[in-house]
């Protein structure tokens, strides 16, 4: 018989590595876009676990898929394949440019696989001197040593000793800088089709087109990090589908599993041939439980009414934020696409995004930040109009306590 451990926020400080600073409250259950803490206080969720809970909490199709698979088969490793993994891979090739899929456990792992594939392909086809990876300042691609180096934020990558080499960071949306630097040594360009952690910054159509054209000119691969933008978040299943260009490699995770950990790298048959047996792998990648849940998520999100509903909900958010801004004048603009939105604070409110987050939490609303100057919203793709209106009313009250 085990002794029940009393779980309070203070236990975090006793037993957890202090690389996080979680809120004081501890959620214990959720339904739709609402969660409840240990004291049964209710919160509206505009954070979605950082763009993960695309169908909200405990959506029936996800619960049913997990329960059904949980009674069949949990794990095999890639010594064998499994039905959920193959069905999901087939589905992902049907809804994207991809012909081949590699499964991982997270966005960082999917990006690691993407970068390794790009380097491997360049070495095999063009020789070892073609190894430069270009990424963009304020980008974010994960926390592994390779991906955090490729991400363009020194605050995350400094302090761990020598970094992987031949990585160059250029300004996002700067065509001239990219033209001036890119060469036949460039192996790949890695970019987010909408910068998330960097402040919810969309690419200009001209920049996106120029990146694709320059990659073609220099025989470099274009890698799209769609960990945050993918799986319906922008109103397209993948954000590239709204930009008029197609990457060579794409990474996806976060909302792919709707809250169950899974990541994937998508690419073409031609490129995939360069990751032969033994060149890369993952013990848990393609796990039957994860793939069964993700298959249910993809089937739900790809419904036309769900994707169309994302843009309808975006309009509700923008209208509500505009109304709040008319009262308090704290936002300079609302950026983003679909349900990946960032309210940029104006000059008087610079550095106070976390203040808004904390104040919102006290009013029963969960939001995010994207840097010190942007309040970020990444709710469920199926959040109801009532939940949006309730949440915006709570945000209004929260801001009123700060002015």
Swiss-Prot record:
CDD domains: OAT_like. It catalyses: N(2)-acetyl-L-ornithine + 2-oxoglutarate = N-acetyl-L-glutamate 5-semialdehyde + L-glutamate. It is an enzyme of class 2 (transferase). Its main location: cytoplasm. PROSITE patterns: AA_TRANSFER_CLASS_3. Homodimer. This is Acetylornithine aminotransferase. Belongs to the class-III pyridoxal-phosphate-dependent aminotransferase family. ArgD subfamily. Its EC number is 2.6.1.11. Its cofactor is pyridoxal 5'-phosphate. May also have succinyldiaminopimelate aminotransferase activity, thus carrying out the corresponding step in lysine biosynthesis. N(2)-acetyl-L-ornithine binds at residues 143, 282. It comes from the Bacteria. The modification N6-(pyridoxal phosphate)lysine is found at residue 254. PANTHER family: AMINOTRANSFERASE CLASS III (PTHR11986), SUCCINYLORNITHINE TRANSAMINASE (PTHR11986:SF113). Pathway: Amino-acid biosynthesis; L-arginine biosynthesis; N(2)-acetyl-L-ornithine from L-glutamate: step 4/4. Pyridoxal 5'-phosphate binds at residues 107-108, 140, 225-228, 283. Binds 1 pyridoxal phosphate per subunit. One of its GO terms (cellular component) is cytoplasm. It comes from Vibrio parahaemolyticus serotype O3:K6 (strain RIMD 2210633). It is found in: Cytoplasm. One of its GO terms (biological process) is L-arginine biosynthetic process. InterPro entries: Ac/SucOrn_transaminase_bac, AcOrn/SuccOrn_fam, Aminotrans_3, Aminotrans_3_PPA_site, Class-III_PLP-dep_AT, PyrdxlP-dep_Trfase, PyrdxlP-dep_Trfase_major, PyrdxlP-dep_Trfase_small. One of its GO terms (molecular function) is pyridoxal phosphate binding. The lineage of its organism: Bacteria, Pseudomonadati, Pseudomonadota, Gammaproteobacteria, Vibrionales. Keywords: Amino-acid biosynthesis, Aminotransferase, Arginine biosynthesis, Cytoplasm, Pyridoxal phosphate, Transferase. Pfam families: Aminotran_3 (PF00202).
């Amino acid at each position: 018989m085990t002794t029940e451990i009393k779980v309070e926020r203070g236990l975090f400080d006793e037993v957890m590595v202090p690389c996080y600073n979680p809120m004081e409250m501890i959620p214990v259950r959720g339904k739709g876009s609402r969660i409840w803490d240990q004291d049964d206080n209710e919160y509206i969720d505009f954070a979605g676990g950082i763009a993960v809970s695309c169908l909200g909490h405990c959506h029936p199709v996800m619960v049913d898929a997990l329960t059904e698979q949980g009674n069949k088969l949990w794990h095999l490793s890639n010594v064998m394949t499994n039905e959920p993994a193959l069905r999901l891979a087939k589905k992902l090739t049907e809804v994207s440019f991809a012909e081949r899929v590699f499964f991982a456990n997270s966005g960082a792992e999917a990006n690691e696989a993407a970068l390794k594939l790009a380097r491997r392909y360049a070495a095999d086809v063009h020789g070892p001197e073609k190894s430069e990876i270009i990424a963009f300042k304020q980008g974010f691609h994960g926390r592994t040593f390779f991906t955090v180096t490729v991400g363009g934020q020194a605050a995350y990558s400094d302090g761990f000793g020598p970094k992987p080499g031949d990585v160059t960071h250029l300004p996002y949306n700067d065509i001239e800088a990219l033209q001036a630097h890119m060469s036949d040594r460039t192996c790949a360009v890695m970019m987010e089709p909408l910068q998330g952690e960097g402040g919810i910054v969309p690419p200009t159509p001209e920049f996106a087109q120029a990146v694709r054209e320059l990659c073609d000119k220099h025989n470099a691969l274009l890698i799209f990090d769609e960990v945050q933008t993918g799986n319906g978040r922008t109103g397209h299943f993948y954000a590239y589908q709204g930009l008029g260009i197609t990457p060579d490699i794409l990474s996806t995770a976060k909302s792919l599993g709707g809250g169950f950990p899974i990541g994937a790298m998508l690419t073409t048959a031609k490129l995939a041939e360069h990751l032969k047996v033994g060149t890369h792998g993952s013990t848990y990648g393609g796990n039957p439980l994860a793939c069964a849940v993700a298959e249910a998520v993809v089937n739900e999100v790809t419904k036309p009414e769900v994707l169309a509903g994302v843009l309808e909900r975006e309009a509700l958010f923008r209208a509500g934020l505009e109304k709040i801004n008319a009262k308090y004048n704290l936002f300079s603009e609302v950026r983003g696409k679909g349900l990946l939105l960032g309210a940029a604070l104006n000059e008087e409110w610079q550095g106070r995004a976390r203040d808004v987050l904390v104040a919102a939490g006290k009013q029963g609303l969960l939001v995010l930040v994207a840097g010190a100057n942007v309040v970020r919203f990444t709710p469920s793709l199926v959040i109801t109009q009532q939940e949006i209106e309730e949440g915006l009313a709570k945000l209004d009250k929260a801001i009123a306590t700060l002015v």
